[in-house]
Every structure is written in structure tokens, then in C-alpha cells.
């Protein structure tokens, strides 16, 4: 980046700490519990912070779990979503479209534990197809880019994935919400 953007000084910033600071400084909170998670940065995927004075944001926990990749990975297999030429391009658009499809679907309680397990297994660009194959065997869903899921099945997949995402998120967040019940999130 130094060759592309000339400057006198460069400051390296931690990705999630920057998210945490941005969130905090847009409020008037003196203390806060802050959760920053996304597809990753130079300081992890899912970080939980505590600040008690607006000047010091303390890292409480760093989970090595990317919830973004498994969430968006279903986009290739849903016919309501335009298939992108490569998953890394879909990474930028699939999640929002899947969120929209959730409203049409119903959570399939039989599928739910398998979807939660899919999230916990840390799928990434190298192993997600293997993990989707396991999910297929467990749920009966077929993940085939040449025969994409349609209608209620696709919508139920979206809703079930959303519920699994939220449940796994809460597994990580709840201990801190319990420990700091009077500190705003």
C-alpha cells in the first residue's frame, strides 16, 4: 500500500479494535461491552471488548471463528440469488441477499443442529465443500451449483441458517452479557 498511497507516515491499525473504537465513539457511553465480528482482519474474526472510561478499549476475548464465511457460502446454491463467477465475489453480496430470503422461510428444527455444527466447524475456502457435503448427508439438502435450491426449500435453508448463525453468535456472546449485565452493549 505504501507504493500506491504516498504519505509521510503510515499507521497500522487493528481491524476489530478500529470497529470497536468507531462504535464506541459514536455514542455517549462512558463504559461499554463491544462485539466486533466479520470475515476477518489482522486481529481475528470475532472479538469482544470492554471499555470503562472511553480511553482504554480492552480485549476480553478473541474467538477464532468466522461466522461470515459459512453464512454467505449458501449463496451459490440458492436460485433466487444471482450466482457470481467466484465465491470470493459472492462474499461481497450473498449475505445481504440471504438475509432477505430469510423472511420467506421457516426454521427447520430438524436441520438446525446440523447448521449450527456447520458454523462451528470453521468452514473456509479450502474445506467448506466437504462440510457442505456432510451437511447434505445430515439434512437431505443437495448443494449443487448446477441444480440450485428453489422456493420454500431455499427459503427455509436461509431461515435455518440465520437461526444457526444467531445461536452460535449467542453461545460466544452470552457469557460476557451475563458477566457484565449492567454495561451497555
Write out the residue ranges for each language-model feature.
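Short acidic/glycine-rich loops and adjacent helix/strand connectors
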Residues: 1-185
Amino acid at each position: 500500500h505504501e507504493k500506491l498511497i504516498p504519505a509521510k507516515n503510515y499507521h497500522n491499525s487493528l481491524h476489530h479494535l478500529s470497529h470497536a473504537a468507531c462504535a464506541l465513539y459514536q455514542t455517549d457511553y462512558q463504559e461499554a461491552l463491544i462485539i466486533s465480528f466479520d470475515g476477518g482482519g489482522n486481529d481475528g474474526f470475532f472479538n469482544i471488548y470492554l471499555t470503562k472510561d472511553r480511553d482504554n478499549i480492552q480485549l476480553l476475548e478473541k474467538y477464532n471463528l468466522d461466522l461470515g464465511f459459512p453464512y454467505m457460502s449458501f449463496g451459490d446454491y440458492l436460485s433466487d440469488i444471482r450466482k457470481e463467477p467466484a465465491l470470493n465475489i459472492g462474499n461481497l453480496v450473498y449475505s445481504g441477499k440471504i438475509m432477505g430470503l430469510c423472511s420467506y422461510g421457516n426454521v427447520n428444527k430438524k436441520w438446525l443442529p446440523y447448521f449450527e455444527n456447520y458454523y462451528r466447524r470453521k468452514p473456509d475456502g479450502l474445506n467448506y465443500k466437504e462440510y457442505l457435503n456432510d451437511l447434505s448427508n445430515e439434512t437431505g439438502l443437495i448443494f449443487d451449483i448446477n441444480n440450485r435450491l428453489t422456493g420454500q426449500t431455499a427459503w427455509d435453508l436461509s431461515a435455518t441458517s440465520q437461526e444457526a448463525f444467531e445461536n452460535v453468535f449467542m453461545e460466544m456472546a452470552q457469557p460476557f452479557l451475563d458477566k457484565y449485565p449492567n454495561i451497555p452493549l
